[in-house]
């Protein structure tokens, strides 16, 4: 199990990123728009750099919902490979069957 503080920090990043994603996308669009003047683009770059670091989606780490494990994460199930195998073997995940051929 991951430390609770690490999991909570990641959840905080998810919330901040969701709240500021539209503003961040708008600023990036202004920065990449070459039809605007250099001063406008530079002002947008300064605003973007003043935004919180945690508002960037790059800083979010996919973690298992049950254990908080950051590695071996399956996006479809939102859990780690270990928990997926445990719950799948006892039939707790609908539609998941053990493969045999």
UniProtKB/Swiss-Prot annotation:
GO terms for molecular function: rRNA binding; structural constituent of ribosome. GO terms for biological process: translation. Keywords: Ribonucleoprotein, Ribosomal protein, RNA-binding, rRNA-binding. The keyword RNA-binding applies. Disulfide bonds: none annotated. It holds the Pfam family Ribosomal_S14. Coiled coil: none annotated. The keyword Ribosomal protein applies. One of its GO terms (cellular component) is cytoplasm. Belongs to the universal ribosomal protein uS14 family. Binds 16S rRNA, required for the assembly of 30S particles and may also be responsible for determining the conformation of the 16S rRNA at the A site. NCBIfam families: PRK08881.1. PANTHER family: 30S RIBOSOMAL PROTEIN S14, SMALL RIBOSOMAL SUBUNIT PROTEIN US14M. Part of the 30S ribosomal subunit. Contacts proteins S3 and S10. This is Small ribosomal subunit protein uS14. The gene is rpsN.
């Amino acid at each position: 199990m991951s430390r609770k503080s690490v999991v909570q920090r990641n959840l905080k990043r998810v919330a901040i990123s969701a709240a500021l994603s539209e503003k961040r996308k708008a600023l990036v669009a202004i920065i990449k728009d070459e039809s605007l003047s250099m001063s406008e683009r530079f002002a947008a770059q300064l605003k973007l750099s003043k935004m919180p670091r945690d508002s960037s989606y790059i800083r979010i780490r996919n973690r298992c919902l049950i254990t908080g494990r950051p590695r071996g994460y399956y996006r479809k199930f939102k859990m780690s490979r270990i928990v997926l195998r445990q719950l799948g073997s006892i039939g707790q995940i609908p539609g998941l069957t053990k493969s045999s051929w």
